[in-house]
Amino acid sequence: MRILLTNDDGIHARGIQALIGELGSIAELFVAAPDRERSGTGHSITVFDPIKVIKAKLAGIKAGWVIGGTPVDCVKLASSKLVGDNIDLVVSGINHGPNLGTDVLYSGTVSAAVEGVIMGSPSIAVSLNSFAADTDFSFAARFTRQVIQNLFKNGMEKKTLLNINIPYLCPQDIKGIRITRLGVRNYENLFEERHDPRGNTYFWMGGGVLEEPQEEDSDVNAVQHSYISITPIHFDLTDYHLVEQYRKSFSQFSHLLGEADDNF
């Protein structure tokens, strides 16, 4: 089995190092991860600057690269050039902090996994619900190994994309596993205005998560109630139940485009 590891916390982050230590016994590991913290970069790619690549010297891996780009750059470059398209699984994480609900749209961790699927490899994103500096990733890494072994034992489609969030609790205090859907995460969205020595204005974004009621089957609710959340997701954002409605409502505009198109 050939696994590509990546993240958005940087190649030296403790989460990805824990995965290297845990997965080396079950797979041939390749690592392509950012050269620094790249959290919150979403699905951005680097198109107007060169992407610098340096070989990484890490124990327990087949090959590794420090990438001067985003998490999506890492997966795209590894799949296209560095490793090739014979990657059996992309694992993104373990993220230092959760990636729940609508936050997946901002998440570099989840976006890297999405890119893995786009490039033809099944993928999982793993996040641990802790921001503490002394966070212990060992249980999350062990759980990830068990998930991977189960997926390959039972078969895994190339379009598989799982977003896993693990509560930061002692294993015996975790109540179980829930297969969930994405919830909603809203923030205070505070912007602190400051001025540099030359008088130019800049802002620091801040504000915490708003504690709001969540649907019982959501990932947010699961982690709040001490369950591991596993959410199957995909990158097709089409709102299918509105497609037919808007086909009808916009058909009246066809005459503005010339001959009417019955397939509008």
Curated annotation (Swiss-Prot):
Broad class of where this protein is predominantly found: cytoplasm
Record's keyword terms, sorted: Cytoplasm, Hydrolase, Metal-binding, Nucleotide-binding
Family, as annotated: Belongs to the SurE nucleotidase family.
UniProt EC number: 3.1.3.5
Reaction it catalyzes: a ribonucleoside 5'-phosphate + H2O = a ribonucleoside + phosphate
Known cofactor(s): a divalent metal cation
Binding-site positions, a divalent metal cation: D8, D9, S39, N95
Gene3D superfamilies, alphabetized: Survival protein SurE-like phosphatase/nucleotidase
Cofactor descriptive note: Binds 1 divalent metal cation per subunit.
Function according to Swiss-Prot or TrEMBL: Nucleotidase that shows phosphatase activity on nucleoside 5'-monophosphates.
Matches recorded under InterPro entries: SurE, SurE-like_Pase/nucleotidase, SurE-like_sf
A GO CC term attached to the entry: cytoplasm
Pfam families: SurE
Localization: Cytoplasm
UniProt name for this protein: 5'-nucleotidase SurE
Single GO term (MF): 3'-nucleotidase activity
Record keyword Nucleotide-binding present: yes
Superkingdom of origin: Bacteria
